[in-house]
Amino acid sequence: IYGSKVQYTASMYWVLGFIFLFTLGGLTGIVLSNSSLDIMLHDTYYVVAHFHYVLSMGAVFAIFAGFNFWFPVMTGLVLHERLAKAQFIVMFIAVNMTFFPQHFLGLAGMPRRYSDYPDSYFMWNQLSSYGSLMSVFAVLLFVLIVWEAFLSQRSLLFVDATLYSREWSDGYFPPDFHSNIYQSYITIYKTYYSK
């Protein structure tokens, strides 16, 4: 969240989604740190939901944030912003629909690594399955967005209008030959940092 002025781009949506999901997974980790509860919940779907919130969605959302942010730097093309935001919303709803009901399944005692379960777990399992299908749709939508960016060849209009981070200071692509002989400098404008 560079420069303390948050711009709600698609990559910022992914960053904020990562922070939310990682925090929620961390809060369930606090529950599991209680040894008496951990004995009861250890081999249940509560643990599955916990580590998917922390590890899987944490990594996936951070990767999507980085890809959305650095795609223009890597290719010189821009992703369709509205479609990228829509893809985030679909994915955010889908992963919460997949893994949040698993907390209730774990609290109800549904064990891990079983091939068949009683019918009392059907409703939450069905909701979780619909969420996973929705996640597949969100990933296919992401592939479609990248494909559309390459087909439309929508390039950056102004390199100067981009962010003031190190990645954007050298232009579109890395030079063909790079050495540490010549240093590049970043110009810091006084208007951005004056009080």
UniProtKB/Swiss-Prot annotation:
Belongs to the heme-copper respiratory oxidase family. The keyword rRNA-binding does not apply. It comes from the Eukaryota. Heme a3 binds at H50. It is a multi-pass membrane protein. Component of the cytochrome c oxidase (complex IV, CIV), a multisubunit enzyme composed of a catalytic core of 3 subunits and several supernumerary subunits. The complex exists as a monomer or a dimer and forms supercomplexes (SCs) in the inner mitochondrial membrane with ubiquinol-cytochrome c oxidoreductase (cytochrome b-c1 complex, complex III, CIII). GO terms for cellular component: mitochondrial inner membrane. SUPFAM superfamilies: Cytochrome c oxidase subunit I-like. Binds 2 heme A groups non-covalently per subunit. Its EC number is 7.1.1.9. This is Cytochrome c oxidase subunit 1. The keyword Mitochondrion applies. GO terms for biological process: electron transport coupled proton transport; mitochondrial electron transport, cytochrome c to oxygen. It comes from Albinaria turrita. Its main location: mitochondrion. Gene3D superfamilies: Cytochrome c oxidase-like, subunit I domain (1.20.210.10). Its cofactor is heme; Cu cation. It catalyses: 4 Fe(II)-[cytochrome c] + O2 + 8 H(+)(in) = 4 Fe(III)-[cytochrome c] + 2 H2O + 4 H(+)(out). Pathway: Energy metabolism; oxidative phosphorylation.
